[in-house]
Regions:
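Mid-domain, small-residue-enriched loop/turn segments at the edges of structured enzyme/sensor domains
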Residues: 66-71, 102-150
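Low-complexity, Gly/Ser/Thr/Pro-rich intrinsically disordered linker/tail segments
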Residues: 297-417
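Extended amphipathic alpha-helical heptad-repeat regions
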Residues: 410-437
Length: 437
């Protein structure tokens, strides 16, 4: 409805008038809570992407050359779906998605969601600042956001995609009872489709059940939400909702002191749980409603496409808007002629061709360095008829043949070594049993 049921603007007893209300006036960096509204909402709503689409969580730079880092600092997870990106708050996956759909589209959606503190080409101390850039995906913006506006954006998702401006009053009358201000209208603006809202809700339920927000659960109530933490721990958030209410909590210091490890860094989630568990007392647990145009479809988890017989144990069921259900079949799992040297599908003149199966995983270095034919953009080895006809190809093939033989010998040696170690271990165990007897 847009009605604000409760608001806390600071700690302790209010001791004055016109004091800082951190819920309506403070502007803070939103961290990963912004991933949902800046990136995944537009990606699913109008960019043709789905929760099953995959991106590679691997080394990636912003356009200015600065590397994008995940919040867990080191290592990469390889191929990940958009659902994984939401559940585990993956920075690299999210930036890649916004890069594809363009920061401009993300910025336009944020304006529809009701944010008033974003800028596009503002001058500050002789420099021009704009929030229309890749860091928008992670909440890296010029000024920040207001709690009440962030909460309203999540309430929009909870409301089936309809934005209603937050209401702090209903009706104002004069001393004669005449209505001066009427704020009871519940009309809103459709920002995202109901199907998009459901998909976001489904993914954010994973955040609460198995992702970064498990601490907010209470009483079996259906909850969807997203955590948010700035890189320097100045701001920590949780924004989420149930079928009844939406709530956003922020913790931090006015002077930007870093929140300390332990209790301070988990306070936003604990506060959210404490508040929401009270306002839901006496309310029945119920599920989020599912629009009629949502379809459940089995896909290959490594391609996000319809599975083939080769996909094996990588199958999963995902929700789709009816008009985005995959029609293409998996192109990750391959069976056919394989180049024994490169591990890629064999080109037309490959001297190392053999029958086999393989996974065309994007994070695999040998796949990334493979050539692409102009005919069908299929990654194949370099041994095409054109390559084989080039001067010096014979010498290259001979070198590769020797390297392949060395690999084979090395593999045989390692297998022999493992066998000898197993025999030795068995002999030691047999001797120990004999000694005990």
């Amino acid at each position: 409805t847009g009605y604000v049921v409760a608001m806390i603007g600071g700690r302790g007893t209010k001791e004055g008038n016109l004091t800082l209300n951190r819920s309506t006036d403070a502007v803070r960096q939103p961290g990963s809570t912004f991933k949902i509204v800046s990136t995944y909402a537009p990606a699913l709503d109008s960019a043709g992407m789905t929760l099953a689409d995959v991106e590679v969580d691997g080394p990636f730079n912003y356009d200015n050359g600065r590397p994008v880092s995940n919040w867990y600092s080191s290592g990469y997870r390889g191929i990940c779906s958009l659902r994984d990106g939401i559940r585990d708050s993956l920075n690299i996956v999210t930036v890649k998605v916004l890069t594809q759909i363009t920061p401009r589209l993300g910025y336009e959606y944020l304006q529809k969601f009701g944010f008033t503190t974003l800028v596009d080409g503002v001058e500050k101390n002789g420099k021009i600042f704009s929030d229309v850039q890749q860091a928008l995906a992670l909440g890296g913006i010029t000024y920040g956001v207001k709690n009440i506006e962030l909460n309203a954006s999540y309430a929009t998702i909870a409301n089936g995609g309809q934005y209603i401006r937050p209401k702090l009053y209903t009706i104002v009358k004069d001393h004669d009872g005449n209505v001066i201000l009427d704020n009871t209208s519940t009309e809103g603006t459709q920002v995202i489709k109901p199907s998009t809202a459901f998909l976001l809700t489904s993914a954010m339920q994973d955040v609460v059940t198995s992702g970064t927000g498990t601490a907010v659960n209470f009483g079996g109530m259906s909850i969807a939400g997203k955590t948010g933490t700035t890189s320097d721990y100045n701001d920590i958030w949780f924004s989420g909702y149930t079928p009844y209410y939406t709530c956003t909590t922020w913790t931090g210091y006015d002077n930007n002191t870093k929140l300390r490890k332990g209790e301070e860094r988990s306070l936003a989630k604990k506060l959210w749980k404490a508040v929401m568990s009270q306002v839901h007392e006496g309310l029945e647990n119920k599920s989020f409603s599912q629009p009629a145009d949502i379809v459940a479809q089995t896909v290959c988890a490594q391609s996000g496409k319809l599975p083939t017989a080769l996909c094996g144990e990588t199958l999963k069921t995902e929700y789709f808007a009816a008009d985005t259900v995959p029609t293409e079949t998996c192109d990750v799992h391959y069976q056919g002629s394989v180049c024994a040297y490169s591990g890629l599908p064999a080109a037309d003149a490959c001297p190392f061709a053999t029958e086999g199966t393989l996974e065309m995983l994007p994070e695999n270095e040998r796949i990334l360095t493979g050539q692409v034919t102009s005919e069908d953009s299929q990654r194949v080895c370099e041994h095409s008829s054109v390559f084989m006809a080039t001067p010096g190809a014979d010498q290259i093939i001979e070198q590769e043949r020797l390297e392949l033989q060395l690999r084979s010998n090395s593999a045989q040696y390692e297998a022999l070594l493992v066998s000898l170690q197993q025999q030795l271990q068995t002999a030691v165990e047999d001797k120990a049993i004999a000694d005990q007897a």
